[in-house]
């Protein structure tokens, strides 16, 4: 009973935090405070660009060179349901759907409080566990307790070994060129990274998506990207004037035609 009460009290802040996440109805104009997030994943969406007289400037990333207005800039709609963030490319039919990891930059102060409460929650579980073990030891013989301790030690060692092997299998050290088996993943999120393209004589072809039309080598393909793949988080870092980190989902994306019918032509800059 005591353990249940502790769990309930310490879980309240986490539940409030989950409830606090704002919903975002389907819209073509996401809030200005979220533009940096959406334009990181959906750099080709029209709401990321300010186009005048055929010249488009990026609204978020000032170091992005102006580009000519063409079919690369697509109409998009976005929406968010707590942990699910999605944007649709509506310029083509059927609409292409992309799922991304939801932003959390608007809750920095609250996350610090939640982390403290989560620590207290963990310590509360430890306390309840110790009370239960002490109560069990008091009612059992010494031999039974020793057997229990041996089993716990064996279980702990096996779990650490399995965890270590899992981390080693999933770990991808920082590098400028990700493993070939992961190119589809990285080039879906970081499609402007140089390792996604094979450029010769000013013409660049996509290494992963064969249906991607060749494009002229220009400032869109200008980033030296470094990738980091940890067990539960994936990052890529764009090296252009200033290092810029971006987080993404680690799951392998479903193959789709993310550029088909969007690049009918490519104007040389």
From Swiss-Prot:
Subcellular location, principal: host cell
Extracellular side: 19-116, 166-269
Stated induction or repression of this protein's expression: Expressed in the immediate early phase of the viral replicative cycle.
Ranges for the A repeats: 1-145
Cell inner membrane in keyword set: no
Keywords carried by this UniProt record: Early protein, Glycoprotein, Host membrane, Membrane, Repeat, Transmembrane, Transmembrane helix
Lipid bilayer topology: Multi-pass membrane protein
Main function: Plays a role in virus cell tropism, and may be required for efficient virus replication in macrophages.
Family that this chain belongs to: Belongs to the asfivirus MGF 110 family.
Protein name: Protein MGF 110-1L
